[in-house]
Swiss-Prot record:
One term under GO cellular component: cytosol
Keyword DNA repair among record annotations: yes
Protein's job: This protein is involved in the repair of mismatches in DNA. It is possible that it carries out the mismatch recognition step. This protein has a weak ATPase activity.
Gene Ontology biological process terms in this record: mismatch repair
Domain of life where this protein originates: Bacteria
The protein's name in its UniProt record: DNA mismatch repair protein MutS
Pfam families: MutS_I, MutS_II, MutS_III, MutS_IV, MutS_V
Recorded GO MF terms: ATP binding; ATP-dependent DNA damage sensor activity; damaged DNA binding; mismatched DNA binding
Family per similarity comment: Belongs to the DNA mismatch repair MutS family.
PROSITE patterns (alphabetical): DNA_MISMATCH_REPAIR_2
Length: 852
């Protein structure tokens, strides 16, 4: 389309749009936000709104779609939720005063990582992440624009970056360096992230400070630059970037957290059925967010853990006071989000009223905490700043019945501003004067139905029906003629109306100005409000953990430095809650200081996975400061939990079950320390039997000899139980069963020693497989059990003297009439797996599989 054929208004649109090619441009035109060209076509499909055209009679009509400005937020939410950016172009001058095209500018770009306003409020954090790279090191910074939280760290490799992004549940990543194509594919295709480029930094000494490393400062400044470039305003609520290190917390990958159902149920993706669901008895949005953080990042500093435990104990010891505290927290609104709305200049009267109500609750909360009379609460009490001067300002300035908008009036309390009160008096007395005029003229004219009405076009007028027109006084002048009546005015009525309209206009302007000044004063308190929010959130989380501990009969864990695990009659917190206390069978877990590995055998569906998850959840709960479901708990402080639980293929990246198993095993073996916890469930089942058994044995021995981490290893390879003869730090345990009259009952109880049967056929029977099939399986099993697999004991790991799996066939069966040993077996025996990395083992096994 030739440029000369484009109207000035559309040229303005195109000039703005070229600066935001990756965003939907919402172009304000009167009472609507309009979209044009491809934006209109796509938005019409996504939002299910009408697609029209701006110039229907032209050869190439311009596609157009629009949404009302007063309901635009809901449409913006849909676009952003689907991963799009939305640029908002507002009218920057009154169209009535404009000369030519109304001036318009983009005032904000809303992206998935920068959502502040939403028609669907969510108490969860919405983190925007930035990544940068110098040499082989990665910098990562993240921020919640809606709360002001701001952090930065350094990471060793790209896999750690991806894991942290997943842990943060980020939807958008700002990239500050040239990504490798393969890395970009991982972020976009596997992690489903929106990527934005930012190569410039935003220099702000107040927010970046000097506590960060150079790389952390670089990535944090690029994140800050992106936020300022999209939000286009000063954001006084942003907090100073805080340095953190992954090792400061109990390290867990996203896959580990998912397999343990920490924040959501892995099967449903919902909160219900997760540890978060179980522990969440918070009463505030801030408390809920902080609880998620505590679950997501348990502590490794024992003193900090005990500090939390001490406060929970105080709450447990004072039931009635705690109940009062819980009740008082219900009156607390989301201070962090309210502060951000003030900073964005979007806080309305209702927001300030909520803030005022919250501040009024603080002295009550503080008094209750003081009534506990315990030194454990002294730190929290110091942080509970009630801000009485701010509470007084809001209470005296804002009418408690004020509307949500700032243009309708009725915002400021009577008595707050003398001039405003005068205008209101004129309006109030004017109404009384009008009533007096109406009564006077009704009596003088004899028109019994005479009344004064008002509309925006005619102002105040006397309404006279046609039947009474002959009685209209001479000093009335006609303002409008209708079918059945006429409207009249008088000089006296016009004078009163003029005074009232002037007072109303001045009152409205003054009230708006007063509200803006009050909001500016509130903004000065943002730092103190954010500190108060953190203190209240901490109180809320600790009372929530106390309530959960009391309700579910949890105990306070203790910690030791001898690498002992002693959990007496422990329970899986979530499974117990779902099943009911009466149905759940507790299990004792014991690792003395010399025991590092429990090799767990037993039938499928018998409770092996629950038993292992029980330990992992107990560690998470203990190190976040919570109490634990058991009769007693004594644990070391772990630095990390590594898991391989479940056998789902990674279909997105094309990785098989076996590949995923080996990669997760490799991560554990490479990174675990003697202070780590490893949970491996049926490792090796993703490949052929002997491949899997060989790898399982080699991994067990590697952990035993070189890693030394506390490990639970569940396996269906019963032959591996013989390892207890050669590995001094390994013990066998199994799930007990009861056989009676041919029926098998799983007791869900862990006992010492190896299992003697797998009971797989019994599980198949429970699943409902046909009887004929089960009988045939039983026959085949009897024949197969004639084979024995002997794992040679190992006294020393070396390339000259290493264990090997040898198969001795004691009985030929019909399934294998022509059995001959495959030469690949000898190659397998020759593998020097004890001097190979897990990844090398995996590649070697893959090569051998190709030869089969």
């Amino acid at each position: 389309m030739a440029k000369e054929k484009i109207s000035p208004g559309m040229q303005q649109y195109l000039d703005i749009k070229k600066n935001y090619p990756d965003a939907f441009l919402l172009f304000r035109m009167g009472d609507f936000y309009e979209l044009f060209y491809d934006d209109a076509v796509k938005a019409a499909q996504i939002l299910e709104i009408s697609l029209t055209s701006r110039n229907k009679n032209a050869d190439n009509p311009i596609p157009m779609a629009g949404v009302p400005y007063h309901s635009a937020q809901a449409y913006i939410d849909v676009l952003v939720e689907m991963g799009y950016k939305v640029a908002i172009a507002e009218q920057m001058e009154d169209p009535k005063q404009a000369v030519g095209v109304v001036k318009r500018e983009v005032v904000q770009v809303i992206t998935p990582g920068t959502v502040v306003d939403s028609s669907k409020p969510d108490s969860a954090n919405n983190f925007l992440v930035a990544i940068d790279k110098v040499g082989s090191r990665f910098g990562l910074s993240y921020m919640d624009v809606s709360t002001g939280e701001f952090f930065a760290t350094e990471l060793d490799d790209f896999s750690s970056v991806c894991s942290e992004i997943q842990n943060l549940k980020a939807r958008e990543v700002v990239v500050g360096y040239d990504l490798l194509e393969t890395d970009e594919q991982v972020l976009v295709n596997q992690l489903n992230l929106l990527l934005s480029k930012e190569t410039e930094g935003y220099d702000d000494v107040h927010l970046i400070g000097n506590s960060l490393t150079d790389l952390e400062s670089s990535v944090a400044s690029k994140l800050l630059q992106y936020v300022h470039r999209t939000q286009m305003r000063e954001l006084s609520h942003l907090q100073k970037a805080q340095h953190y290190e992954i090792k400061d917390y109990l390290q867990m990958s996203y896959a580990t957290k998912s397999s343990l159902d920490l924040l959501e149920n892995a099967r449903t993706g919902k909160k219900h059925g997760s540890l978060f669901w179980l522990l969440d008895k918070t009463k505030t949005a801030m408390g809920m967010r902080l609880l998620r953080t505590w679950i997501d990042r348990p502590l490794v500093n024992q003193a900090s853990i005990i500090e939390r435990q001490n406060i929970i104990q105080v709450f447990l010891d004072n039931f009635f006071e705690r109940s009062d505290l819980t009740e008082s927290l219900k009156g607390v609104y989301d201070i962090e989000r309210l502060a951000s709305r003030v900073s964005f200049g979007k806080a309305n009267p209702k927001d300030l009223i909520q803030l005022g109500h919250t501040l009024a609750q603080v002295p009550i909360i503080k008094a209750i905490l003081e009534s506990f009379n315990d030194d454990a609460l002294s730190g929290l009490l110091q942080e509970l700043d009630a801000l009485p001067e701010l509470e007084s300002l809001i209470r005296s300035a804002i009418d408690p019945d004020a509307p949500a908008t700032i243009t309708e009036g009725g915002i400021i309390r009577d008595g707050f501003d003398e001039t405003l009160d005068k205008y209101r008096k004129v309006m109030s007395e004017g109404t009384s004067w009008i009533a007096d005029i109406e009564a006077k003229e009704r009596e003088a004219s004899g028109i019994t139905t005479l009344k004064i009405d008002y509309n925006r076009k005619d102002g105040y007028y006397f309404h006279v029906t046609n039947s009474n027109l002959s009685l209209v006084p001479d000093h009335f002048f006609r303002k409008a003629t209708l079918k059945n009546s006429e409207r009249f005015g008088t000089a006296e009525l016009a004078k009163i109306e003029g005074e009232m309209l002037e007072a109303r206009e001045k009152s409205s302007t003054l009230e708006y100005d007063i509200f803006m000044r009050v909001r500016e004063q509130v903004e000065r308190y943002i730092d103190r409000l954010q500190s108060l929010a953190k203190a209240i959130a901490t109180v809320d989380v600790l009372q929530s953990l106390a309530v959960t501990a009391e309700t579910n009969h949890y105990v306070r864990p203790v910690f030791n430095d001898e690498h002992r695990i002693a959990i007496d009659r422990g329970r899986h917190a979530v499974v117990e809650k779902v099943m009911g206390v009466q149905e759940y069978i507790p299990n004792t877990i014991t690792f003395d200081s010399q025991t590092n590995i429990q090799l767990i055998t037993g039938p499928n569906m018998s409770g092996k996975s629950t038993y292992m998850r029980q330990l992992a959840l107990s560690v998470v709960m203990a190190q976040m400061g919570a109490y634990v479901p058991a009769d007693s708990v004594d644990l070391p402080v772990f630095d990390a939990i590594y898991t391989r639980i479940g056998a789902a293929d990674d279909l997105i990246s094309g990785q098989s079950t076996f590949m995923v198993e080996m990669m997760e095993a490799n991560q554990a073996i490479k990174r675990a320390t003697p202070n780590s916890l490893i949970i491996f469930d049926e490792l090796g089942r993703g490949t052929a039997t002997y491949d899997g058994m060989a790898l399982a044995q080699s991994i067990i021995e590697f952990i035993h000899d070189k890693v030394g981490a506390k490990t639970m290893f569940a396996t269906h390879y019963h032959e591996l139980t013989a390892l207890s003869n050669s590995l001094t730090h390994l013990v066998n345990v199994h799930v007990a069963t009861l056989e009676k009259d041919g029926e098998v009952t799983f007791l869900h109880k862990i006992v010492d020693g190896p299992a003697d049967k797998s009971y797989g056929i019994h599980v198949a029977k429970i699943a409902g497989l046909p009887t004929d099939l089960l009988n045939r399986a039983d026959t085949i099993l009897t024949q197969l059990e004639g084979e024995t697999v002997v794992i040679q004991p190992q006294e020393k790991v070396s390339s000259q003297e290493k264990p090997a799996i040898e198969t001795h066939v004691n009985e030929q069966i019909s399934l294998f009439d022509d059995f001959t040993e495959n030469p690949v077996l000898q190659e397998l025996r020759d593998l020097d797996i004890y001097n190979m990395t897990p990844m090398q083992v995996m590649m070697a096994v893959a090569d051998l599989k190709q030869k089969l």
